[in-house]
């Protein structure tokens, strides 16, 4: 029979109650107390990381995610969230590592492919970025974001014919994105 830790349960339910009531500062305080008692608790680390990010303290959130991903059972989404925040903080090489780690754990995590593509663009590693963004479009073919970034990369690489193909494709399901790309690139593309 599994033993229930009532102290841990009390911390957890207090934090949940405060979150539901909109008292996020109290929830943070409760979760910090929980970490004092249970320093490696995944629930407390993940919840604090999320609440710190919501409160605008991205570095504190990164610190919590780093502790969370250091656990042997770290999940792909924890690595993805860490990468996302690192990219926001312009920690590009660290973000790339985190996205790659997320993809090692779950190669179908489309958001991580997109994040990886963005970090590679920022490092001007365009060939790798194209591969990552294409993988995202395979997993999420109707999401315009990776298509948009692909077109931008092709324009940066002086490949307008590839950008035209993407704009034409976007006109079929996301005409606003297609129009934005036409304005930004100066290309006028007829729908096929």
Question: Where is each model-derived feature located?
Answer:
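Terminal, low-structured helical/coil segments at or just beyond the last alpha-helical repeat
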Residues: 2-8, 14, 156-192
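Alpha-helical segment of the N-proximal tetratricopeptide repeat
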Residues: 7-56
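Helix-start (N-cap) detector for alpha-helical repeat units in TPR-like alpha-solenoids
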Residues: 7-8, 42-43, 76-77, 110-111, ...
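Canonical tetratricopeptide repeat
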Residues: 13, 47, 81, 115, ...
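TPR/TPR-like alpha-solenoid repeats
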Residues: 17, 51, 85, 119, ...
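Structural signature of tandem alpha-helical TPR/SEL1-like repeats
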Residues: 20-33, 55-67, 88-101, 123-135, ...
